[in-house]
A protein has these predicted regions:
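An anion/pyrophosphate-binding glycine-rich loop and adjacent beta-alpha core
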Residues: 1-80
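Solvent-exposed, non-transmembrane amphipathic alpha-helical segments
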Residues: 35, 71, 113, 117-120, ...
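Structural signal for hydrophobic packing residues in well-ordered secondary-structure cores
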Residues: 55, 59, 97-104, 158-165
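A conserved FAD-binding loop/helix module that cradles the flavin
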Residues: 140-165
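A structural preference for long, well-packed, hydrophobic secondary-structure segments
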Residues: 127-132, 159-167
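Generic structural hydrophobic/aromatic packing signal, biased to beta-strands
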Residues: 13-17, 51, 114-116, 126-128, ...
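A glycine-rich dinucleotide-binding beta-alpha-beta segment and adjacent secondary-structure elements
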Residues: 76-144, 151
């Protein structure tokens, strides 16, 4: 942040885990909504948990968060993400944190704070042609799932529109 009052020594980043369902799974949106409901049920919203507590299978308490090396930068309720996230998703997050720790030592520190959960929904039902053209504007197509992909998609489509106007 440019504003010194908002600066911290912490780095915030997001780990996204995609889940693609196959038959006979019928309601992927309902599945995601149930995860969000669990989070709200257990913490009233966003839950924060120390990485060390998660690995040890224990809930983070207000006291442990207060004594933590890092001060939370987001408003959240101390809790247990393992009561919200399915095991395979949680295993993927833990595996990624350990992998990041190899290139950014300290990422897998006991005091690293994890916030959750955020559930995103993507619609893959919208038809687009080979030039990514559809009757939809923006990322309503559900083709891109990140800011970088959406940006690249926008540049590509803008070039195609410019080409069609020239010729």
């Amino acid at each position: 942040y440019e504003d010194p009052e908002k600066q911290t020594e912490c780095t915030n980043f997001a780990l996204l885990v995609s889940k693609h369902f196959s038959e006979p799974f019928k309601d992927s949106n309902g599945y995601g909504e149930s995860i969000a409901r669990l989070s709200n049920m257990l913490g009233g919203g966003v839950i924060v948990q120390r990485f060390g507590d998660l690995i040890r299978g224990r809930r983070s308490t207000p006291k442990r968060i207060e004594e933590n090396t890092f001060v939370p930068t987001l408003s959240a309720t101390p809790g247990d993400l393992s009561l919200v996230l399915p095991k395979r998703i949680l295993d993927g997050i833990i595996e990624m944190i350990y992998a990041l720790d190899k290139i950014a030592p300290g990422t897998a520190n006991d005091d690293t704070l994890l916030y959750g959960v955020e559930v995103k929904f993507y619609n893959m039902e919208v038809d687009v042609d080979e030039n990514l053209e559809s009757r939809h504007i923006g990322d309503g197509s559900g083709v891109t799932h990140s800011l970088s992909h959406a940006s690249a998609s926008g540049v590509y489509v803008a070039r195609k529109i410019a080409e069609s106007l020239e010729g």
